[in-house]
């Protein structure tokens, strides 16, 4: 089982990171293939709303923008399990969490039935 654990906190040793590292160790202890990612270590951008991923000529679930988040999104789509943690600042998750969710969700959302290209996942 492939599991990806993503820390969307800028603080690598505080509460969110501690909880995620505990989950990482737990998954690893039962034999999962686990990858841990700190979002604040990579260069990423949010969705630019260019709609290229919705073009009939574009392969589904491919975001046009290439940055450090692009290969991570591809690995997320191949994974069996995704665990993301973010602290809450001013009532909202961090900007890096939002950027990840915008890029991930928008490119897998089907305008045909407003469902996901990855039904059941």
Spans of features found by a protein language model:
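Residues that form or flank phosphate/diphosphate-binding pockets in enzymes
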Residues: 14-15, 45, 92
């Amino acid at each position: 089982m492939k599991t990806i654990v993503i820390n969307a906190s800028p603080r690598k040793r505080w509460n969110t990171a501690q909880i995620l590292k505990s989950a990482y160790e737990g998954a690893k202890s039962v034999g999962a293939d686990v990858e841990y990612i700190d979002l604040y270590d990579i260069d990423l951008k949010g969705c630019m709303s260019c709609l290229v991923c919705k073009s009939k000529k574009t392969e589904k679930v491919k975001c046009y923008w290439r940055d450090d988040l692009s290969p991570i999104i591809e690995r997320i789509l191949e994974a069996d399990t995704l665990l993301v943690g973010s602290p809450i600042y001013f009532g909202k998750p961090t900007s890096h969490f939002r950027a990840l969710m915008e890029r991930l969700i928008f490119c897998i959302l089907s305008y045909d039935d407003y469902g996901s290209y990855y039904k059941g996942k």
